[in-house]
From Swiss-Prot:
InterPro entries reported for this sequence: EF-Tu_GTP-bd (IPR041709), EF-Tu_GTPase (IPR050055), EFTu-like_2 (IPR004161), EFTU_2 (IPR033720), G_TR_CS (IPR031157), P-loop_NTPase (IPR027417), Small_GTP-bd (IPR005225), T_Tr_GTP-bd_dom (IPR000795)
Protein name in UniProt: Elongation factor Tu 1
Superkingdom as given in the UniProt entry: Bacteria
Source species of the chain: Wolbachia pipientis wMel
Subunit structure: Monomer.
Residue ranges, annotated region (G4): 131-134
Gene transcribed to yield this protein: tuf1
Pfam families: GTP_EFTU, GTP_EFTU_D2, GTP_EFTU_D3
UniProt-recorded Gene Ontology molecular function terms: GTP binding; GTPase activity; guanosine tetraphosphate binding; translation elongation factor activity
Binding site for GTP: 19-26, 76-80, 131-134
Reactions it catalyzes: GTP + H2O = GDP + phosphate + H(+)
Length: 390
């Protein structure tokens, strides 16, 4: 979400490589950085630093590179399980994904799973790189392209218009000057620049602030504090208080930061917002302040979840239908029950599954909202809302 033009002098986009194991994701990442970034050798990418996000360890490699038009931050994961976790936990929110498919083997099970996950977690664009073209048969490459386009369409991406680049990441890494070598990387970068739109900066989106704390200031009224997630708020604007109970309308009568009054607050800032005529007991942590009509409270939704393994600090045993953990959404824990789908009877630690969740109280939410699943105060899983039900 950060189109930080200021820092790099050009728009910024987050991308990542996805695709089946051994189809060449890491080799491609190395080839791109060799020609467009500070070169990172293959074995350095694979020895990724372990990142801890919400207590879940994901091995990811972060590299960056730039074209004349843009700056890209790129994430590559060594193992399939890490991809699944990374996409669900959102340790690296991808604006676009480069789908790597071997021209020798064509789409494989993880190719499908990664495309489906990309759709569920809201990756906006996919660009395809058909790899190993130097050792694949030309007819086979045409067939692979057709299959990949069909697969993308099946999972809701515009399969007919997705750019497909054919090449060899290994040849590109060896500085080969043929069509399949460095030229294929140039073409891939060109397609990323052309096809992937720079995401709107959070500031341009409708105002939203998850409430962290509520204070009563004598003579001035009620102040709520939190970090503005997106948009801007100005004194005098009408806002809604959403979630946990009936939605209320109020007016922002002041925005303050570090005891200073501001004329407006914008995305990324931690602020206090003074609410007109709202009593201290009418607002609580876990609700959100938002621009009227932009977000609604819901109790039932479908989600894509990852359940931590025992070694990651998760449960030691499986759970069954109607399991009732806490769901930590934005700033608060809410109890809910999990319904298993597709005839599944239980979920093992380490599994990635689609589930239906029903919360005991409604929470302001949109598709794409990420949450942690907790039990007795510790995180046992992580998820992302894939569809609102009611």
């Amino acid at each position: 979400m950060t189109a930080v033009v200021e820092a790099f002098g050009k728009p910024h986009v987050n991308v990542g490589t996805i695709g089946h194991v051994d189809h060449g994701k890491t080799t491609l990442t190395a080839a791109i950085t060799k020609h467009y970034g500070n070169f990172v050798a293959y074995d350095q990418i694979d020895k990724a630093p372990e990142e801890r996000k919400r207590g879940i360890t994901i091995a990811t490699a972060h590299v960056e590179y730039q074209t004349e038009k843009r700056h890209y931050a790129h994430v590559d994961c060594p193992g399939h399980a890490d991809y699944v976790k990374n996409m669900i936990v959102g340790a690296a929110q991808m604006d676009a994904a480069i789908l790597v498919v071997s021209g020798v083997d064509g789409p494989m099970p993880q190719t499908r799973e990664h495309i489906l996950l990309a759709k569920q977690v809201g990756v906006g664009y996919i660009v395809v790189y058909i790899n190993k073209a130097d050792v694949a048969d030309a007819d086979m490459i045409d067939l692979v392209e057709m299959e990949v386009r069909e697969l993308l369409s099946k999972y809701g991406f515009p399969g007919d218009e997705v750019p497909v680049v054919v090449g060899s990441a290994l040849k590109a890494l060896e500085d080969d000057s043929s069509e399949y070598g460095k030229k294929s990387i140039d073409k891939l970068m060109e397609k990323l620049d052309e096809y992937v739109a720079v995401p709107p900066r959070p500031v341009d989106l409708p105002f939203l602030l998850p409430i962290e704390d509520v204070f009563s200031i004598s003579g001035r009224g009620t102040v709520v504090t939190g970090r503005i997630e997106k948009g801007e708020i100005k004194t005098g604007e009408e806002i809604e208080i959403i979630g946990l109970k009936a939605t209320q309308k109020t007016i922002c009568t002041g925005v303050e930061m570090f005891k200073k009054l501001l004329d407006k607050g914008s995305a990324g800032l931690n602020v206090g917002i003074l609410l007109r005529g709202t009593k201290r007991e009418e607002v609580e942590r876990g609700q959100v302040l938002a621009k009227p009509g932009t977000i609604t409270p819901h109790r039932k939704f479908k989600a894509e979840v990852y359940i931590l393994k025992k070694e990651e600090g998760g449960r030691h045993t499986p759970f069954f239908a109607n399991y009732q953990p806490q769901f930590y959404l934005r700033t608060t824990d809410v109890t809910g029950s999990i319904k298993l789908l597709d005839g599944k009877e239980m979920v093992m630690p380490g599994d990635n599954v689609s589930v239906e969740v029903e919360l005991q109280v409604p929470i302001a939410m949109d598709k794409g909202l990420r949450f942690a699943i907790r039990e007795g105060g510790r995180t046992v899983g992580s998820g992302v809302v894939s569809e609102i039900l009611e």
